[in-house]
Amino acid sequence: MELLLGREAFLRLAEALDEPARVAFRPNDGKGFRVAGTLAAVPWSSYGHYLNERPAFTFDPLFHQGAYYVQEPSSMFVEQALRVCGLPRKVLDLCAAPGGKSTLIRSCLPPESLLVSNEPVKLRAQVLVENMLKWGHPATVVTNNYPADFGVALPGCFDVIAVDAPCSGEGMFRKDNPALEEWSTDNVMACASRQRSIVKDVWPALAEGGFLIYSTCTYNVEENERNVMWICRELGAELVKLPVDAAWNITGSLCSELSGPVYRFLPHLTEGEGFFLALLRKTVPVSQGNRRTKPVVLPKLKEPALSWLASRPEGWRLWQSGDQQWAIDGALAASVGQLLSALKVLSAGVELAMVKGRKLQPLQGLALSHCCCADAFPRVAVEGEEALAYLRRLSLTLPPSVPRGYVLLTWQGQPLGFVNNLGAHANNLYPQNWRIRSGYTTTIDNKFIERVG
C-alpha cells in the first residue's frame, strides 16, 4: 500500500486503522421505521446512519424483528451503483451472506422486482435465510448454489448481478486479526484467480446490457483494478461512471493501467472500512446454452393460510417443500417457478406454515413479513424481559383472557413471533437456531430508530 499511496498517505492510513471502526445501521423503511434524532448520515446512502457507540444489538428485540440492519458504512455505496442500473426486474446477489448488501439492495429496488440472494456455503446460507426473512420483503428468494449453476441454467436471466467477491480482506485488518494473520502475496493471487472464476462462471446469467456490481473489501490492485480490466477484456464489458460527490473523499484507480471509473474507500479519508467497487455494463450477446428446465407450476394458495396474508392484485401461489409451505406473490410465480426448477432454493416469498397433520402451524417468517395480515391472529404485547425470554425460546405464560391456539406476540407494536397458547403455558415457536444463547438479562434502550406515524 505504501507503493500505491505514497509514504505520507500510507502513514495516515496506518494511523486510521488504529482507531475504532465506525458503527452504522439502516432502518427498515419497508416496516415503517426511520432514524430517530439527529444521527450523522452515511453520505453515500439514503438509509445509512452512524451510531456514536456500539450497543449490544443482541439484546434489542427490534434487531431480531428486522427493524434495522447493522452494516459496514463503506459497503452501503452499493446503493449508488444500483441507482444507475435503472429499474431492474431481476437482481442476483451472488455472494450474499450474511445479508447486509442484499437487505440494502432490496430496499432500493421497486417492490415488484425480484431479488435472488445466493450463498454457496451451506452454513452461511442459513444465516442469509434468517436475515432475509427478518427483513420481511416477499419478493425475495434465497438460494444455495455455485456461480456456474446460474450461468448454465439461467442464461440472460438477470438485469443486475452483484458480486461481493471473497477476497484477502485487507480492508478488514482493523477489526479482524485472522485476516491479517492469513495475508500473503500468494493468498492475494489465489483470491484474484478465484474472483475471476466466479465472475466468468456467472457471466452467462447476466443479460446483454445488464450491469455487474463488482466489489471487494481489500486494497490491492490484483483483486480490484486488474480484475476489472480482465472482465472488460475477456468477458466483454465497459465501466460505468457513478455520480460521486467530491466531499465524500472517495479515491479512484490506484493502478496506472486503468484510468476508468472505479471507487475506493480508504479509512483515512472516509468513515468506514476498506472497500472497492466498480460498475460494469455487459456489452456482448448472451449465449443461450443447451440446458433447459421446465418451470415449476405453483398452485393457488387456499384457506386458511390465504387469510393470513394481505391481498395481492394477482393473488398468492403456494410452494411446498417437504412439510414447509411458502407463499409466492402471483405476479412473481412464473419467475420463481423458473428458479425452483433450476436451483437449490432455501426460501422464497413468505415463509408461511409447517404442515402438522391436517393443521397448519404459522412460521416465524410470516410474523416478520410485510404481508402478515394484522388481524389474522390474536395479538399480545410483551415487555422487555418477556421479549428476551421469547427470543431465548423459553416457555411463556399468557394472561387468562388470551384465547387458546396460535397467538402473535408483539414488542413496541411490531410483530415478534408466534406461540401456541395451551392455557397453563404457551409453547414457544421461535426457530431453535435463531434463539439468543447468551444468558445476559438486559434489554437495550433503543433510541436510534422509531416507527413512522
Where in this protein do the model-derived segments appear?
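Mobile active-site "lid"/loop adjacent to the S-adenosyl-L-methionine
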Residues: 123, 159-201, 213, 217-225, ...
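Helix-to-beta-strand junctions that scaffold the AdoMet/dcAdoMet cofactor pocket
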Residues: 110, 206-208
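A short acidic, Gly/Pro-enriched loop at the edge of an enzyme's catalytic core
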Residues: 86, 151-164
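Conserved SAM-binding loop of SAM-dependent methyltransferases across substrates and taxa
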Residues: 98-111
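Class I S-adenosyl-L-methionine
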Residues: 158, 211-214, 218-327, 331
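Polybasic, low-complexity RNA-engagement segments
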Residues: 1-36, 273, 283-453
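Conserved class I S-adenosyl-L-methionine
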Residues: 88-97
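S-adenosyl-L-methionine
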Residues: 118-156
